[in-house]
């Protein structure tokens, strides 16, 4: 198949790589001058299957209400008016609330953990195949707590992860200091922590840029500095992507048997133009 992948972040490039491995013809499109220039440029660097509890839980609605009045809140919902203009925001909010119960939480945890473990194995396979160097550290990930109540809650979360096969465990302050001696300078404030030996870290940008180069070497067409201006649909099928070259302003239609949308937060508005409502 002739497949067009929109977005050259870590998701788009990884998708392109696996499609090439499966024997497809791939064109990778991005508006930036090279891969990993937006969401994948600088992130937390964590590859942490053990921290994948969904934000939608029974305590989230009350917390979200409190957070609405804080500019530093981890979850913000800023209502758009008129409602008709931002209907997708309210639709997302209702879907979020519908998942704020124990039944949905357990179901979602199981699905996210399964996806995370699968993704982690896929990453290991790509690294083994390519030998990509991206400042990878396989030393696990530790989180520290300075509040007793938060530490107690972390114990419940760790137990939940262990039920799903993830090796996240509670550790004492002394165990934390053995894992990472740098914590010593503020050890008196630490009440405990969690540690997951199977988690790791690395530079997402380095990984993505190198994998994009490998995609090009395998025959992928890399179209950087191109804006996506539309999706062309015939019936229920997207058969081409409308592009504009930034350098010349020339527009073109890129034909495809299939299109992968990996544009981060821009995916939802792009797909709405063809009647697909992505809850992102």
Regions found by a protein language model. Name each.
Residues 44-174:
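Dinucleotide-binding Rossmann-like beta1-alpha1 core, especially the glycine-rich loop
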Residues 8, 13, 174, 226, ...:
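Structural detector for helix-capping/boundary residues
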Residues 21-41:
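Glycine-rich FAD pyrophosphate-binding loop
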Residues 24-25, 166, 220, 276:
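Short phosphate-binding/catalytic loops that engage adenosine nucleotides
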């Amino acid at each position: 198949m002739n497949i067009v992948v929109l977005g050259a972040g870590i998701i788009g490039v990884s998708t392109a790589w696996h499609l090439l491995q499966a024997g497809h013809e791939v064109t990778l499109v991005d508006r930036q001058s090279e891969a990993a220039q937006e969401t994948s440029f600088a992130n937390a660097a964590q590859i942490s299957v053990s921290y994948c509890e969904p934000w939608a839980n029974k305590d989230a609605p009350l917390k979200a209400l409190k957070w609405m009045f804080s500019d530093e809140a981890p979850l913000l919902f800023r209502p758009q008016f008129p409602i008709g203009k931002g209907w997708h925001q309210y639709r997302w909010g209702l879907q979020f609330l519908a998942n704020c119960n124990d039944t949905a939480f357990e179901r979602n945890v199981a699905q996210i953990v399964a996806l995370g473990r699968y993704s982690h194995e896929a990453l290991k396979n790509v690294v083994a195949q390519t030998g990509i160097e991206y400042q990878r550290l396989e030393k696990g990930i530790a989180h520290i707590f300075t509040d007793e109540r938060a530490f107690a809650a972390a114990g419940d979360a760790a137990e939940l992860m262990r039920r799903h096969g993830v090796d996240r465990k509670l550790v004492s302050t002394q165990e934390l200091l053995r894992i990472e001696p740098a914590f010593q300078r503020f050890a008196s404030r630490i009440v405990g922590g969690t540690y997951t030996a199977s988690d790791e870290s690395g530079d997402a940008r380095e990984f993505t840029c190198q994998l994009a180069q490998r995609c090009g070497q395998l025959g992928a067409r890399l179209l950087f500095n191109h804006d996506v201006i539309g999706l062309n649909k015939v019936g229920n099928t997207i058969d081409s992507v409308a592009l504009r070259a930034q350098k010349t302003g020339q527009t073109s239609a890129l034909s495809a048997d299939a299109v992968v949308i990996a544009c981060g937060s821009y995916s939802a508005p792009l797909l709405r133009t063809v009647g697909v409502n992505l809850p992102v």
